[in-house]
Amino acid sequence: MTRRRWPATLTHLDLLRPARRVWTSCLADCRLATLEREVVGVVREDDIAGGLIPSLYFDFLRSRRAAPLGRVLAHNRDDVLTLVGLLGWFGKALTSREELSAAELGGLGRLWEPVDVERALDYYRAALAAGLSGAPAQAVRLNLARWEKRSARWDAACTLWEAAARDAGFDPRPWEELAKFHEHRRRDFVAARSVVDDALGLAEGAGVSSRVRDAFAYRRARLERRLLPRG
């Protein structure tokens, strides 16, 4: 546009990053077409594929026939309207949680985490309370437990680690955290060894890597040494 400055004072707002944080765990992808269909609830009819637009533009440069560009302009118009719809979704979601799914609550936790940890933790707790399940729930539990640990809220952290340890499929991370808590915070070596024994039993059945099993075995041997009578 002949190098003229944009007259508006508002800065550019890129919705791609927040969209990825919110929906990456519950949608197949975060392409605009997917967000338009699954979030905004719009299905386009007779839309031109974005990959065809460059060739239509070069055809126009050669032929000077502008008619085929009508579908391109309609496509771009619909893209902008979808972004308006997404912006409206974010505006509503950040002021009211009533219609949000458990997965979206977890995604909003990820969105807030870099700038407002306590608000992020509130969303994570809400996601779990709303019935978040599977791998997204496991990720939220462990992330939430990490922040509870940083704040020395040990009861809350242990509750989350215990829930994560009960998750279907063996995940060594909560077991390791529980073992470290009992050994280093409570100085309860018997409880720590019991956690490690349970973890080793599950690890054997789950067929995890030898590196994981060796780490637990090393921890158990150290606990055994600490339990020996001091002479």
Regions found by a protein language model. Name each.
Residues P114-V115, S151, R185-R186, L227:
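Structural motif corresponding to the intra-repeat A-B loop/turn of tetratricopeptide repeats
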Residues L108, N143-L144, L178, A192, ...:
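Structural register within alpha-helical repeat arrays
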Residues M1-D78:
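Metal-dependent phosphoesterase core characteristic of DEDDh/y 3'-5' exonuclease domains
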Residues W112, E148, H182-E183, E224:
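Residue at a conserved register position within TPR or TPR-like alpha-solenoid repeats
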Residues L132-A135, G169, E204:
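Short coil turns that delineate tetratricopeptide repeat
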